[in-house]
Regions:
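N-terminal lobe/hinge region of extracytoplasmic solute-binding protein
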Residues: 30-80, 199-200
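Surface-exposed binding/hinge segments that line
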Residues: 88, 107, 121-182
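Alpha-helical secondary-structure segments
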Residues: 102-109, 153-159, 202-203, 231-233, ...
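Gly/Pro-rich hinge or "lid" segments in bacterial periplasmic/extracellular proteins
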Residues: 154, 160-233, 241-243, 354
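Ligand/substrate-recognition segments at binding pockets and active sites
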Residues: 211, 353, 357, 361-432, ...
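Ligand-site clamp/hinge motif
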Residues: 221-267
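Detector for C-terminal structural segments
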Residues: 305-336, 383-393, 417-529
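Structural transition elements
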Residues: 322-363, 382-386
């Protein structure tokens, strides 16, 4: 009996020590809710993009300060006018199943992203490539006409429509991920929906997955740079309730979580509380398929009736900044010589309730209406979105005598409604993918996958194409400022603020980067101590 007890004690000690070891190698994050898809050619939300950033590596990767570092490509060069880029892949880059990652894998992934049958919302991110837009539209059927050429197993040559000096930043976007075609054809439509049907070209593999609860990632032992990755595991939990998330942090079930203004009061002098820029611009987006909201003066009236300076001071406790350009300010997006937003100036008009009343009256007259019909604004019910929505609701009631309903829902439900145009007004935000203002401004291009307003302006479309085809930064900035002025006049969105996130971070976590551009988190140098 004593021998049995001794064996049991030893086993228990071993289990406990293993648990402690595992915990010291595991970063635990809360991503609130499941993404719609983790297929890199289909992912279209922040959770999906974060998962893909763990299990997918593209040709280049993002540094802590938002620049491009070698990824699967160990080096690259371009011709004199930046229209032909050649990427040289490292020969020790492997898929998690041991297969080599080749230039053909990138070609296969990009062709799949552009295939009209794939119906990827971010296919337009590849339209820089020669004939990509025509192929996606079905006007060109032969994929060999695309500007994607496999020189050999480890050399990929890409021909662009126009000069693009920052294409090495563009290829960081997950839509540019490689595809292991043999594996993909084996698992079919189950691709990236379970650990068994997932494959990784990146730092981690999916170890386990409990739907709507958690995903555990384990270091990919076939990753070329595995020896320099300190975290063995990343556990991603889905806790959408703000109170439950804070409790999980207190109980050390997660290492970091966003907190609301109200929750931040509890942690007023707590060193675990930090403030980060997340790069997003927030606004009221208007569904212009709605007859009333198709009227520009109505949209202008609603926008001018909300005091965004007061929103920052009175509602958000000075976390964030009132927005006057759609392109987020202060996150490293440079114009000609300084921050693009500063060079553009205060483009969107300031709060003006008198002007708002005048515009409302004129808009109603044009529509032949006596008063504004009942409208509803939807918002995802996390963070500070509810109190922001209530502030907007009260502002419109006080300044315009307009009563709108507000309806909270999950992020995914809000996104689905916007994608299907099953909404009138939505409180929404947008983040850029790379350090250039066009990453924000191209979303108002007619039929862009993120153009949930269904806004269309021929001059704007012309400017987007011009900016994307120009290598002259002074001309590009001039044109992008004109684009800002066009949307400030047409107002497919009513600008509100540039968001900052108040977070709790466990001090055991070191070198985690909360990035305002591209990835939400950069974990390459993160460790637990």
């Amino acid at each position: 009996m004593k021998k049995i007890l001794l064996v049991f004690t030893i086993l228990l000690a071993f289990v406990i020590s293993c648990g402690k070891s595992s915990d010291s190698e595991t970063l635990k994050l809360n991503l609130k809710e499941e993404g719609k898809s983790y297929d890199p050619q289909l992912a279209n939300d922040s959770t999906g993009e974060f998962v893909d950033s763990l299990v997918t590596e593209t040709l280049t990767r993002q540094s802590d300060d938002g620049k491009s570092l070698p990824g699967v490509a160990e080096k690259w060069e371009h011709n004199a006018d930046s229209t032909v880029w050649t990427f040289h892949l490292r020969k020790n880059a492997k898929w998690s199943n041991g297969d080599p990652i080749t230039a053909k894998d990138f070609r296969d992934g990009w062709v799949r992203a552009l295939d009209p049958k794939t119906a990827g919302e971010y296919a337009d991110k590849l339209f820089y490539i020669k004939n990509a837009e025509q192929f996606n539209a079905g006007k060109i059927k032969d994929e060999n006409q695309l500007g994607i050429k496999v020189i050999d197993d480890y050399t990929l040559q890409v021909t662009l429509n126009n000069p693009l000096t920052y294409f090495d930043s563009i290829v960081r976007i997950q839509t540019y991920a490689p595809l292991n075609k043999k594996f993909y054809e084996k698992v079919g439509d189950k691709y990236m929906t379970s650990p068994e049907t997932s494959i990784s070209s990146g730092v981690y593999v999916i170890k386990s997955w409990t739907r709507d609860s958690e995903i555990v990632f384990e270091k990919n032992e076939n990753y070329w740079n595995k020896d320099n990755i300190k975290l063995k595991y990343v556990k991603m939990l889905f806790i959408n309730d703000p109170s439950a998330s804070v409790n999980a942090f207190k109980n050390k079930e997660i290492d970091s979580t966003n907190i609301s203004i109200e929750q931040a009061k509890e942690f007023k002098n707590d060193k675990r509380k930090i403030l980060t820029k997340d790069g997003s611009v927030w606004y009221m987006t208007y569904n212009m398929k709605n007859k009333v909201l198709a009227n520009k003066k109505i949209r202008q009236a609603l926008s001018l009736a909300v005091d965004r300076e007061k929103l920052i001071t009175d509602v958000l406790d000075n976390t964030g900044e009132a927005a006057y350009t759609y392109t987020t300010k202060g996150i490293g997006i440079i114009g000609v010589s300084k921050d693009f937003s500063e060079e553009a100036g205060k483009v969107f008009p300031a709060y003006n309730p008198q002007k708002a009343k005048q515009l409302l009256a004129e808009g109603l007259k044009e529509l032949g209406l006596q008063k504004l019909p009942e409208l509803t604004m939807i918002f995802n019910d996390s963070g500070n979105n509810k109190i922001i929505s209530e502030y907007i609701q009260e502002s419109l009631r006080t300044n315009l005598g307009v009563n709108i309903n507000i309806e909270g829902m999950t992020f995914q439900s809000r996104l689905d409604k916007m994608q299907h145009r099953d909404y009138e007004i939505a409180l929404a935000g947008y983040n850029g993918d790379y350090n250039d203002a066009i990453t924000y401004l191209d979303r108002f291009l007619t039929k862009d996958g993120n153009n949930y307003s269904d806004y269309s302006n021929p001059r704007y479309d012309e400017l987007v194409k011009k900016v994307k085809s120009s290598g002259n930064q002074e001309e590009r900035v001039k044109d992008m400022i004109e684009m800002e002025k066009i949307i400030a006049e047409d107002m497919p969105v009513g600008l509100l603020y540039y968001r900052q996130n108040t977070k709790l971070l466990n001090p055991r976590v070191h070198n985690i980067v909360f990035s305002p551009i591209g990835k939400d988190f950069v974990l390459d140098n993160t460790y637990i101590k």
